[in-house]
Amino acid sequence: MAPEENGTCEPCKTFGQKCSHVVKKQRAKFYILRRCIAMLVCWHDQNHDRKDS
């Protein structure tokens, strides 16, 4: 099993470094999720407006 698969980072030795690494990964995932939701909402609004016209 690769170190990245089980959530550990081999070069990160301290608990604080591990937490920082996990937080950065989660923030990146959350950012992508937010962007996808915003894109879908805008797409839905545009399609809804076209149907009303």
Curated annotation (Swiss-Prot):
GO process annotations (BP): negative regulation of cell population proliferation; regulation of cell population proliferation; response to light stimulus; shoot system development
Glycan-carrying positions: 6
Bilayer topology: Single-pass membrane protein
Keyword Lyase: no
One cellular component term from this protein's GO annotations in UniProt: plasma membrane
Tissue: Mostly expressed in stems, flower buds, flowers and seedling shoots, to a lesser extent, in roots and young cauline leaves, but not in mature rosette leaves. Barely observed in cotyledons and leaf primordia.
Segments for region (Required for DVL/RTFL small polypeptide activity): 14-45
Effect of a null allele: No visible phenotype.
Compartments in which it is found: Cell membrane
Keywords in alphabetical order: Cell membrane, Developmental protein, Glycoprotein, Membrane, Transmembrane, Transmembrane helix
Top-level taxon: Eukaryota
Induction conditions: Accumulates in seedlings within 6 days after a shift from dark to light.
TM ranges: 30-46
Presence of the UniProt keyword Cell division in the record: no
Pfam families: DVL
Main location (coarse class): membrane
Function in brief: Small polypeptide acting as a regulatory molecule which coordinates cellular responses required for differentiation, growth and development, probably by restricting polar cell proliferation in lateral organs (e.g. leaves) and coordinating socket cell recruitment and differentiation at trichome sites. Regulates the positional cue and cell proliferation along the body axis.
Entry's family note: Belongs to the DVL/RTFL small polypeptides family.
Descriptive protein name: Small polypeptide DEVIL 16
Organism: Arabidopsis thaliana (Mouse-ear cress)
